[in-house]
Design a protein with these regions (language model features):
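N-terminal accessory/interface modules of nucleic-acid-binding and processing proteins
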Residues: 1-328
């Protein structure tokens, strides 16, 4: 097995283990938000401390379960640039960069032409808690955010929020997408591709339990359906990118799309600082996801990449992006 394949397999094995042991709480590490010393809030989705961009796609899973006070990461050299050092004996986390580079190819007649090739490169990052900067982590993050705010101006501040998200914040995000949301059938939530609308059970029908509010359930489910809504050709264009031939109910392709939607919902909740809770039918998909990932580990990369593309489309619809940090 190639070195990159081993690293991918290690990440997939970790996620499979979480799915098998934590069941519908397997994505919990990136839910909610973190308060900075200056009382600002940031989402719990990991980000690079130098670029201040969130790790996205497969990298979310590379850092999954690494529970630290602040989700700030950087490479060994980046921490040195920040005036710190990685503590002796610390083990880093592998994250990857997928890119393309120019090359020259030859056609069947021997004529050279310009082309590109794809590559996947892994590198190691550490959390700020693993460094000599740990004691002033919150202050350093807040300072970096303030510097970015002064450079961008208030209207372009994509990096922080001054309070936890309100229902009005979440509703504004949904409204800006332009998706048609109806509340015709209580107790049922679904996206109808042929008519291009989402049906949601009314907010007042959602009951809280185990410390999770009905509002948490409602918006987590709505974000799941919004990810389904993005799959059309004019949005995130996922209609032809399903790795399975069949996409009917109960098929492998259907389960894959559900995995994309759940990952996308988790990303959206995380970026908005909202608590992610599972779909009511989440458990029925877990077994099929585990089996699919064991059979083909690369599916997690495909699903996370498509979920990230879907989230970025939702972000592109926003008139006011002040409630989330910039993504790569």
């Amino acid at each position: 097995m190639k070195n990159n394949d081993k690293k991918i397999q290690a990440v997939v094995d970790k996620i499979i283990s979480l799915m098998e042991t934590e069941q519908d709480k397997w994505f919990k590490p990136f839910s909610g938000y973190t308060r900075l010393p200056n009382n600002q809030f940031i989402s719990n989705q990991p980000f690079n401390l130098v670029s201040m961009r969130n790790y996205t796609g497969f990298n979310i899973f590379c850092l999954f379960g690494s529970a630290y006070e602040y989700p700030a990461y950087a490479t060994y050299n980046q921490f040195k640039e920040l005036g710190g050092n990685v503590n002796k004996g610390e083990t880093g986390y592998s994250v990857c960069y997928y890119g393309t580079a120019p090359t020259t190819k030859t056609d069947k007649d021997g004529n050279a032409f310009d082309s590109t090739y794809s590559f996947l490169k892994f590198f190691t990052v550490f959390n700020i808690a693993q460094t000599s900067l740990a004691d002033k982590a919150g202050e350093l993050i807040a300072k970096k955010l303030s510097k970015i705010e002064s450079q961008k101006g208030d209207k372009e501040n994509l990096y922080k929020k001054k309070s936890i998200p309100t229902v009005a914040d979440l509703e504004n995000f949904v409204k800006n997408t332009g998706a048609k949301i109806v509340h015709r059938e209580a107790g049922r939530c679904f996206y109808v591709p042929s008519l291009d609308y989402i049906n949601m059970s009314p907010l007042d029908t959602w009951k809280g339990k185990n410390g999770i509010t009905g509002t948490d359930f409602y918006y987590s489910t709505l974000f799941h359906e919004l990810i389904h809504w993005t799959k059309t050709e004019e949005r995130a264009n996922r209609t032809k990118n399903n790795p399975f031939d069949t996409t009917g109910f109960g098929s492998k392709g259907y389960a894959f799309e559900e995995l994309v939607a759940e990952i996308g919902s988790a990303i959206t909740c995380s970026m908005l600082g909202h608590t992610k809770v599972p779909m009511e039918n989440h458990a029925q998909y877990l077994a099929s996801w585990v089996k699919a990932l064991k059979d083909k580990p690369s599916l997690l990369m495909k699903a996370s990449a498509q979920a990230n593309t879907a989230f970025k489309f939702l972000m592109s619809t926003q008139e006011n992006k002040m409630i989330v940090r910039k993504v790569a």
